[in-house]
Regions:
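Exposed beta-strand-loop-beta-strand "reactive/processing" segments of non-cytosolic proteins
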Residues: 54-59
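Hydrophobic beta-strand residues in large extracellular and virion-surface proteins
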Residues: 42-44, 60, 67-69
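Generic structural signal for isolated residues within well-ordered alpha-helices
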Residues: 14, 29-32
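Feature activates predominantly on carbohydrate-active enzymes
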Residues: 25, 29, 49-51, 63-157
Length: 157
């Protein structure tokens, strides 16, 4: 009798967990760099390009009064977020200012913006840089650096 209850319970938990919507990593990044002001205002959608997966790309449009960023990888979505913030919203994130609150009303793109790169490897720094001050960073500082790399499309740290 107990085994039936256990199996039913495990099945129910498995079903519940599989029905939860998957949150993309870029959602957490967006919350960090916008100081918690992007939720339900900037939407992300992953749609791999079927014809040519060798080029990372993102597209920025408006959907139901919200910003929609579509890309074919997590990195493309993060780069699209940075592009939107800088060129549409006028928010420049820098190494010394890696986060900023969004304005109450987000400017929407007037049309579809599409950017792509044919470069498969996008490097950042050189191999000895990591043994300078970075060796003494804590997780909070590393998270900011990883966010910075993602926002700029770096895939080869």
């Amino acid at each position: 009798m107990n085994i039936r209850i256990l199996i039913t319970l495990l099945f129910g938990v498995t079903l519940f967990c599989s029905c939860q919507p998957k949150q993309l990593p870029v959602n957490s990044l967006a919350e960090r760099v916008t100081e918690g002001t992007s939720k339900d205002r900037i939407l992300f959608r992953m749609t791999p390009e079927k014809d040519d997966v060798s080029k990372d790309y993102f597209e920025i449009t408006a959907e139901d009064g919200k910003v929609l960023i579509v890309g074919n990888s997590d990195l493309s979505l993060a780069t699209g977020l940075n592009w939107y913030l800088k060129y549409v919203a006028g928010i420049h994130l820098s190494w010394n200012n890696p986060s900023q609150k969004l304005p109450e009303v987000l400017p929407l793109p007037t049309g579809k913006i599409r950017q792509e790169t044919a470069m498969q490897n996008r490097y950042y720094l050189n191999y000895c840089t990591y043994s300078y001050s970075m060796a003494f960073w804590d997780w909070e500082r590393w998270e900011k650096e990883i966010d910075w790399m993602a926002l700029h499309g770096i895939n080869m740290p």
